């Protein structure tokens, strides 16, 4: 551990050779490296392994990685792009993993992830877009606190609880939208009023609206924009607009207003059985 900790003269690209399976705690913390090449089958990134690497701009982890320990990439202030491993054994984004990564703009959580721990993305002040895993169950306290440019986040129906007093969404952008995979999540979002307009989980009705996708998700390239309702997708159905009531009656809308709740309308595709006899034109 701490092999190159605070070696500020260590810069450029670091190549991790074949045969290395773990990056121990603090190994490259507070160095000046700008990129990393993984040539082997690394499975674990240790505690604070790349913390405060102020020149590190992008990282693509190999699909062999199963564990990213707490604080691994915290305060990497130039980190703009991070690609998670596609590994069914990678199930948790640990505490403070990306805390203080002020240039990180978007996060696509892989389907294997079931838990995002506390403060995982806290203070990511340039984070604009987050798409959570459809298998996510747990979101820790302050996970996205002070992500002040975050214009949209999708919370899948698989999330079973949003604990009170955790300030998960505190500090989102004006006219931002929180997309909910199920209407069951509405009550969780509105629980425990901290004041007349905001709740203890950080949802502020003066700044943010809710949009229920009713099982719909979003394509990987979907852009969430303040004041605009993004278009969801749902297998076996066609999206038929956003509405201001759960019955999806009246006129569809495309823009959002803070404090409102919107509902997605779907038209189910039906494949009618067609039988034709040989030689028939009917």
Show where each model-derived region lies.
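Consensus positions within tandem repeat domains that build extended binding/scaffold surfaces
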Residues: 1-5, 24-27, 46-49, 69-74, ...
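Secondary-structure capping and domain/repeat boundary segments
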Residues: 83, 180-182, 198-282
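Structural signature of tandem-repeat unit edges
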Residues: 8-22, 31-44, 54-67, 77-92, ...
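Sterically constrained small-residue positions within well-ordered secondary structures
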Residues: 52, 75, 100, 123, ...
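Short, aromatic/basic amphipathic alpha-helical patches
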Residues: 165-168, 188-204
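Small disulfide-bonded, cysteine-rich extracellular recognition modules and tandem repeats
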Residues: 7, 76, 124, 147, ...
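Intrinsically disordered, low-complexity segments enriched in proline/serine/threonine
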Residues: 3, 19, 26, 64, ...
């Amino acid at each position: 551990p701490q092999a190159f900790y605070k070696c500020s003269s260590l810069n450029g690209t670091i190549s991790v050779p074949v045969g290395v399976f773990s990056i121990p705690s603090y190994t490259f913390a507070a160095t000046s490296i700008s990129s990393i090449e993984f040539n082997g089958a690394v499975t674990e990134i240790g505690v604070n392994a790349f913390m405060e690497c102020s020149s590190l701009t992008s990282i693509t982890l190999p699909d062999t990685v199963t564990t990213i320990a707490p604080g691994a990439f915290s305060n990497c202030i130039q980190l703009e792009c991070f690609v998670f491993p596609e590994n069914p054994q990678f199930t948790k984004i640990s505490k403070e993993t990306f805390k203080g990564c002020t240039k990180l703009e978007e996060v696509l959580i892989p389907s294997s992830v079931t838990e995002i721990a506390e403060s995982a993305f806290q203070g990511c002040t340039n984070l604009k877009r987050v798409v959570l895993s459809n298998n996510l169950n747990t979101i820790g306290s302050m996970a996205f606190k002070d992500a002040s440019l975050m214009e949209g986040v999708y919370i899948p129906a698989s999330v079973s609880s949003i604990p009170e007093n955790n300030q998960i969404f505190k500090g989102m952008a004006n006219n931002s939208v929180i997309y909910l995979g199920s209407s069951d999540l509405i009550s969780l979002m509105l629980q425990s009023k901290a004041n007349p307009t905001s709740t203890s989980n950080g949802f502020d009705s003066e700044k943010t609206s809710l949009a229920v996708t009713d099982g719909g998700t979003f394509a990987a390239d979907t852009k969430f924009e303040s004041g605009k309702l993004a278009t969801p997708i749902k297998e076996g159905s066609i999206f038929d607009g956003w509405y201001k009531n759960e019955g999806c009656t009246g006129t569809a809308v495309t823009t959002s207003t803070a404090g409102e709740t919107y509902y997605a309308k779907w038209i189910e595709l039906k494949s009618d059985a067609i039988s034709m006899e040989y030689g028939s034109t009917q």
